[in-house]
Amino acid sequence: GVAFGTVAHPTARLCLEWLHDHNLEGKSVLDYGCGSGILAVAAKKLGASRVLGTDIDPQAIEAADYNAEVNRADASFYLPEDMPDEKFDVVVANILSNPLRLLAPALLARVKKGGYLVLSGILERQAEELIEVYGSYRPDSPLSVWKSMDGWICLAGQIH
């Protein structure tokens, strides 16, 4: 498997575990709000065929590019306005619950039919509200709590 230090925040660990527990072989993955690119690098190492990351912070893009290079992971990172217009088998977003709420339509639009949306950066008490928000856009594709760790949760669901 992929080894990362125990320093990772619980939300990053939850997302890493989700990626690890699902077969990414030949799949496309978008790391939305990629930060240093840890999830994108992991997805590539776990067999994803195409991996993109996006972040609003230009310094994050630089850090992610660097981390992908040193880990020999073929992943590309973009500012949101430069992102190619495509859909992905897996969209993972480890950001905070407020931006996740506002980004619901944008994130859902990036998931291929039958693909998965994986969200973290969410406190247990925020889960219900986010499940409702995403459900209001896609009643046919409910998200649910996949796992929790130290008061943080990971929501995931298949988008139909």
PLM regions with names:
Residues 1-3, 29-33, 111, 117, ...:
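Short glycine- and Lys/Arg-enriched binding-loop motifs that mark or flank ligand-binding interfaces
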Residues 56-160:
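S-adenosylmethionine
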